[in-house]
Amino acid sequence: MIYFIFLQVVMVLVSVAFLTLLERKILGYIQLRKGPNKVGFLGILQPFSDGVKLFCKEVSLPLVSNFMPYLVAPVFSLFLSFFLWTLVPFISYGAKFNLSFLLVICAMSVSVYSIMVAGWSSNSKYSLLGSIRAGAQTISYEVSLIIIILSPLMLFKKLDLEGYLVKSSYVGWPLYLCLPLGLCWFTTILAETNRTPFDLAEGESELVSGFNTEYMGVGFALIMLSEYASILFMSLLFSVVFGSMSFLMFCLVVYSYLWSRGSYPRYRYDNLMHLCWKSLLPTSLMFLCFYWSLSQGG
């Protein structure tokens, strides 16, 4: 079992490497340029070159930082991302747990602590402010995300990924029957993973990055690896819940992640919170009541 989990982690790392290449290629064509095309054939080795460069950089600790939390936070964030991948239903040697959906929700809730600790332990006011706004954003959108996840689970009465996938494949669960809920889910996971147009946690186009301002080299690479691994997992979870684990839908959601980065400007923070509490939360509660009534009727 350990061998298969190790193999799975390696596959996720390779997928993340090529996801970064795909993102840079898509952004390049959106901005009418080529993107990376120098390292290897058509730039295919560019992510490995970037990885070697990042992991070979010198790690200099900020003088007034809290060293242990500063070093542990990126590792913990990456561990949580890999832990979620052990629950996916297509790995028969993965973790067997009857409440795997509940475990996914718990792991996503704990992930906010790595952001908070990373910003606080850097002992920089810019990192601290970035971690505070990232924590508030993540906690706010987790409320809507949990309600959205519970809506189809209540209909099928399954709390494990594998059982839900089997039952939904028998019944059929096309996205066009629940398009508003799918759109709410996609908007919420964009905010949950701190992606454009909700990338207020990083603010990469600003002069000061955010909670990862003081990170460099290995620490920065681990934070980025955990972010992109979470993107892949959220896309897979979307395809499991709404598309009976369709590979085409998984690719479409990943592409939509990357496309939104090249198409939309960043939201203002007050608009971000208004969208969560005044639009997504009432809509998700309405769907929760609707699916609960369907489950009671059946």
UniProtKB/Swiss-Prot annotation:
GO terms for cellular component: mitochondrial inner membrane. GO terms for molecular function: NADH dehydrogenase (ubiquinone) activity. The keyword Hydrolase does not apply. It is a multi-pass membrane protein. The chain crosses the membrane at residues 2-22, 71-91, 99-119, 136-156, 171-191, 231-251, 272-292. It is found in: Mitochondrion inner membrane. Its main location: mitochondrion. GO terms for biological process: aerobic respiration. PANTHER family: NADH DEHYDROGENASE SUBUNIT 1 (PTHR11432), NADH-UBIQUINONE OXIDOREDUCTASE CHAIN 1 (PTHR11432:SF3). Belongs to the complex I subunit 1 family. This is NADH-ubiquinone oxidoreductase chain 1. The gene is ND1.
